[in-house]
UniProtKB/Swiss-Prot annotation:
Pfam families: CTP_transf_like. Pathway: Cofactor biosynthesis; NAD(+) biosynthesis; deamido-NAD(+) from nicotinate D-ribonucleotide: step 1/1. It comes from the Bacteria. This is Probable nicotinate-nucleotide adenylyltransferase. Signal peptide: none annotated. PANTHER family: NICOTINATE-NUCLEOTIDE ADENYLYLTRANSFERASE-RELATED (PTHR39321), PHOSPHOPANTETHEINE ADENYLYLTRANSFERASE (PTHR39321:SF3). One of its GO terms (biological process) is NAD biosynthetic process. Catalyzes the reversible adenylation of nicotinate mononucleotide (NaMN) to nicotinic acid adenine dinucleotide (NaAD). One of its GO terms (molecular function) is ATP binding. Belongs to the NadD family. Its EC number is 2.7.7.18.
Length: 216
């Protein structure tokens, strides 16, 4: 199976995660998207909300969309959520699957700062969601890497389908001007204004946040 992996703190999970993931699934004809909540993200500040609540919210989204499955290997680990470690575990547990790790252009620009980042290409394909506002400078090492990988894929043509790892797939996605930080601030300031939140969050996530009084 061809599996997309989308990691994040999901604090909370919102349409800015959900819609691009569905667009990637359709663009690359993936069988499923696995949502992988972080426990201790190594590249940014830790989550504001506890593990159990973030896990429950992701599970709610998975129950609403059969395109998604919950992948809990990172959130159950007490060490930093290094992507290479997670993908090593996944490829060992599911050797029959072909994994596509999904990231935004903002993350791809900084990929060379990630722990053992080059090993990722031995474990999976990389999907780069191209959204407005993020441009790769021609002098960037990542720009060179993307150009080389995309050229290699063009030369290989149909044979790329037989390669289970090592490619970069740029995917144009619809702009989603949504961030978890802004959602948390909005909830804190407005005390759960459903009308304002409904374009940002699924209804069952709004209900969950309200029920458990999160982000107050």
């Amino acid at each position: 199976m061809r599996i997309g992996i989308l990691g994040g703190t999901f604090d909370p999970i919102h349409y800015g995660h959900i819609r691009p993931a569905l667009e990637v699934k359709n663009a690359l004809n993936l069988d499923s998207i696995w949502l992988m909540p972080n426990h201790i993200p190594p590249h940014k500040a830790g989550p504001k909300t506890g593990t159990a609540h973030r896990l429950a919210m992701v599970q709610l989204v998975c129950s609403q969309h059969n395109e998604f499955e919950l992948c809990d290997i990172e959130i159950n680990r007490d060490t930093p959520s290094f992507t290479v470690t997670s993908l090593q575990q996944l490829t060992q547990a599911y050797p029959e699957h072909e994994f596509y790790f999904i990231m935004g252009m903002d993350s791809f620009i900084q990929l060379d700062r990630w722990y053992q980042w080059q090993t990722l290409f031995e474990l999976c394909h990389i999907v780069v969601c191209q959204r407005p506002g993020w441009q790769l400078e021609y002098t960037s090492p990542m720009a060179t890497l993307m150009q080389i990988k995309v050229q290699q894929q063009a030369i290989k043509g149909n044979s790329i389908k037989e390669t289970k790892v090592g490619s970069i797939f740029p995917v144009n996605i619809t702009a989603q001007d949504i961030s978890s930080t802004e959602i948390r601030a909005q909830i804190s300031a407005q005390s759960m204004n459903n009308q304002a939140l409904s374009p940002l969050l699924p209804a069952n996530i709004i209900d969950y946040i309200k029920q458990h009084q999160l982000y107050r």
